């Protein structure tokens, strides 16, 4: 029996066909898993974010350190009791000390208006003459030849019952010698002789004196003559003190008015009319006496108060006699000296505040050096502190100011850091985002 004939397989069918075992052995492709992909992405994002945060933290501004101000209680000093005379008027100052009274005076009493000043006017005469005819250091100035005209001035002064000193035609004195005769015995005739010598006439002097006074703001002082004998020659107590300050600052006149006496060739011994010289530190300046002015004294003195040297200038006018005036000024002086006090602005290394950083470091704001101020009279001292905002601080760095107010006058003192606040570093920055970024 013939078997059924199978259809012939084409070569393609043979080659292309796959048996079941072969098919089972072929590898299978896997589809990506979504969760794995997400994990990789998140990891990359976290790494990137961490790097960005770290970079931001490393470069971010640090928080400002907390500043605390150390409060300083105010200081109050009571006014002293000054023993002014019961008559006349007066004022007193201390060179370089701002006083509480008008014009920076320490104290004053009586009239503040214009008053006759007698021979205190010779302070103006001497200063104005020297402004026109200065005496060079180490010299005695020009030589002045006196004539019969000067003898006439002497006779006129005698007739007016004014103070005089001898003069003769042909007498020659240096300018320094002539000024000595003017100031010590208060010679009226020498006041006119010097004024005419320097300015050509009394009128020329009066015009120059007016200009000189105006240039110094002394508008309350009026000179109607060279000696002060005229009642129209007036000033205020405040301006008389200023004139005294100008005189003691002059290198020619200050030594002259401090001399008790002097021997002048052709004139003789001249005595200083200021009997207080050498008492209570008094070393000047000028007496004055007229019926209208009474007995007057413009005085200066050197004292040591609160361990410091102080020069004071004062004036008292209107006394009945010079002995009474001298006694009253001697009573006055210690009561004025008692009114000085030293006010401490800052002590060396005094704490006025502190800084504390968010990471626990601290520094103190302190004054670098001790500073003090000499004051007189009723005084109120208050202190205010201004600390600069800082993140880090170097030792010795200026960090603020303490303003010490003394009777309305501010005295600023810089504050410096005692201690160091440093950058806390990368570790603190990356672990304290709340402090760093708020």
Can you say where each PLM-predicted feature lies in the sequence?
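Acidic/histidine-enriched alpha-helical segments
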Residues: 252-266, 344-357
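A penicillin-recognizing enzyme superfamily signal
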Residues: 254-340
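Hydrophobic membrane-insertion alpha-helices, especially the h-region
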Residues: 38-53
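Solvent-exposed coil/turn segments that connect beta secondary-structure elements
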Residues: 95-97, 131-133, 147-151, 197-199, ...
């Amino acid at each position: 029996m013939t078997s059924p004939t199978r259809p012939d397989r084409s070569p393609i069918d043979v080659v292309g066909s796959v048996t079941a075992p072969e098919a089972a052995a072929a590898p299978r492709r896997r589809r990506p898993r979504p969760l794995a992909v997400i994990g990789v992405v998140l990891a990359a994002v976290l790494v990137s974010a961490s790097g960005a945060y770290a970079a931001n933290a490393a470069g971010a501004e640090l928080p400002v350190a907390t500043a605390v101000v150390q409060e300083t209680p105010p200081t109050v000093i009571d006014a002293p009791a000054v023993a002014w005379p019961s008559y006349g008027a007066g004022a007193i100052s201390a060179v370089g000390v701002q006083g509480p009274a008008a014009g920076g005076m320490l104290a004053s009493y009586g009239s503040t208006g214009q008053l006759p000043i007698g021979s205190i006017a010779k302070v103006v005469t001497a200063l104005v003459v020297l402004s026109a005819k200065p005496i060079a250091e180490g010299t005695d100035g020009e030589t002045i030849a006196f004539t019969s005209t000067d003898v006439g001035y002497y006779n006129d002064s005698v007739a007016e019952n004014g103070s005089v000193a001898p003069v003769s035609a042909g007498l020659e004195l240096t300018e320094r010698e002539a000024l000595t005769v003017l100031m010590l015995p208060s010679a009226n005739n020498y006041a006119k002789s010097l004024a005419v010598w320097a300015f050509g006439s009394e009128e020329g002097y009066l015009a120059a004196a007016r200009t000189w006074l105006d240039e110094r703001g002394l508008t309350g002082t009026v000179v109607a003559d060279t000696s002060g004998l005229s009642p129209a020659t007036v000033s205020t107590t405040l301006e008389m003190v200023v004139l005294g300050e100008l005189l003691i600052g002059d290198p020619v006149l200050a030594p002259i008015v401090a001399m008790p006496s002097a021997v002048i060739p052709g004139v003789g011994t001249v005595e200083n009319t200021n009997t207080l010289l050498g008492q209570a530190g008094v070393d000047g300046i000028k007496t004055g006496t007229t019926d209208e002015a009474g007995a007057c004294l413009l005085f200066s003195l050197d004292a040591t108060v609160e361990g410091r040297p102080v020069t004071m200038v004062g004036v008292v006018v209107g006394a009945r006699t010079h002995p009474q005036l001298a006694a009253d000024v001697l009573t006055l002086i210690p009561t004025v000296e008692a009114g000085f006090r030293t006010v401490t602005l800052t002590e060396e290394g005094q704490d006025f505040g502190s800084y504390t950083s968010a990471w626990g470091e601290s520094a103190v704001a302190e004054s670098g050096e001790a500073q003090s101020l000499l004051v007189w009279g009723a005084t109120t001292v208050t202190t205010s502190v201004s600390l600069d905002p800082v993140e880090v601080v170097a030792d010795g760095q200026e960090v603020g100011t303490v303003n010490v107010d003394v009777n309305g006058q501010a005295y600023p003192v810089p504050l410096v850091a005692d201690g160091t606040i440093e950058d806390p570093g990368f570790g603190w920055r990356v672990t304290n985002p709340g402090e760093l970024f708020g």
